[in-house]
């Protein structure tokens, strides 16, 4: 090769490397023996913003149907707190192979525009769970650390191991400005910390299939999750309390339309008399916008904090016509609801 061209090629390669910039690894890399205290707080404000009920072409007031209802009171709030102490006994293949988790706090509280309020703590508070990775089952085995504790396994068997936000990490090394996405059940797991979404959906689907209403909840939940996507962007580093933390910006703006007509019609057909005919339309339109950021401690290999807000709007348009033995009737419901959610998480 001509020496001049060789030098030009090397110079071009060096320029390309400089243009691409250095790559950083945002990865879970906690050392064995590490203990982390983690806190997750979720608050939601919900409201029913509009409701129209019609029957045989006439708009109805819910109060006229005997319902004690005022749209101004159709709102409420919900709060959820989970705090744990995680002890990492063994790490393998980028995840805990053995983890001891003490549940310090697991409680929820609510209030409504009707004046109702309350709170409840889980029986698992104060207990320690042991997660052990089972390679053959490709899943974690969960058990109580104390065999003397009489707690129903239902209280903890759906508690997810991943409270490290690992699902939010990029698959490869990244440069500042690089983006990636998470969606579906991974995103649902971020919104509901501590819940094993796959197990919860499987359990709900099994319960529904054993009941009188043959609704495929798994199909429904996957349809809802399909359009939910978060975009994550690596925004470089930031000095916080003498630590250099990696900044991951969180964003998302998505819409989803669901036509549940066939699913609901199938569910109610078994309850209808043979001579009845039903024409049904149920459409749900959803839109959401998310913003926030996660700070990742690259040196320690775990998240330091996450703050995220999400605004969610849902519009339901349900209409039906029934002809039962020559007696025809029609009705419909139009409703619009909204929710503002705030999620905060810390690990130290």
What is the role of each PLM region?
Residues 1-8:
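Bacterial N-terminal signal peptides that target proteins for export
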